[in-house]
């Protein structure tokens, strides 16, 4: 049914998002033990990403990606970006390479998509953007190591 709607209204972003969500739910409900969403045929996964990317493209302002958008477009953008970021994180979680991208590249894509969703009003995505940001993780690791070394030094002196 959604295929017909999209064929008749190819510029309707919401239909692309709905089809992607339904497709993901259908895939996840049919998984066997030990499988993950990326166990589905690659064409189905590509279709998911295509629908989400198309919804983003249709919802962004033509003049500039940073131009103001309507409330409807903001809702479409935050939903599509969050959904795509979720898929990138699932790929990281399941150690799946997408289009030859490894864990760090996928985490970076997820972080960027979460940041984009946050820009359009998704507060959970804002938090996830910070959590998945590879640079923030690296800085956090450096600070933790420095604190650990400082504590070792104090313990040795004390």
Predicted regions and their residues:
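Short helix-capping/linker turns of helical repeat alpha-solenoids
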Residues: 8-13, 26, 59, 69, ...
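Residues that mark the junctions of alpha-helical repeat units in TPR/alpha-solenoid scaffolds
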Residues: 12, 16-19, 48, 70, ...
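Alpha-solenoid helical repeat scaffolds
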Residues: 17-18, 67-68, 75-82, 108, ...
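Short coil/turn linking the two alpha-helices of tandem helical-hairpin repeats
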Residues: 20, 25-35, 85, 90-101, ...
